[in-house]
């Protein structure tokens, strides 16, 4: 079985998704993992494809001409004050470009809150055929494997991973 690789957007964050796709193809990657969920961080580029139809068209052309596929989108963060429906436009784009998953991480709240919100994200992603892959980040609220597994077991969603 051939190993397949995905170019993560954080590796080339200064490149919009179309350019990133051409780079991935030239470097031999099978997939790209894009960041169409804008977080509003200082200096962060905005690649909200749902709000940028021209960039989305260019991205689709790049995918079609290179054969590179979309592995996942990021980052559906769980944080206090989150309304998970804000991620719906990005999930629609993810499904439109053939992505497999939404990457998520948990950055705030008590356990009951973040389990509920992660579950809601899973529920929103499921009709699009997307899994929601929980990443634990050392500086986040859910910051180790044990905590991530606890969340996955607690939500009991078939598309949680």
Residues covered by each model-derived region:
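Acidic/histidine-rich catalytic cores of soluble enzymes
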Residues: 3-9, 15-21, 32, 94, ...
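Structural motif corresponding to the early beta-alpha repeats
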Residues: 18, 29-120, 126-131
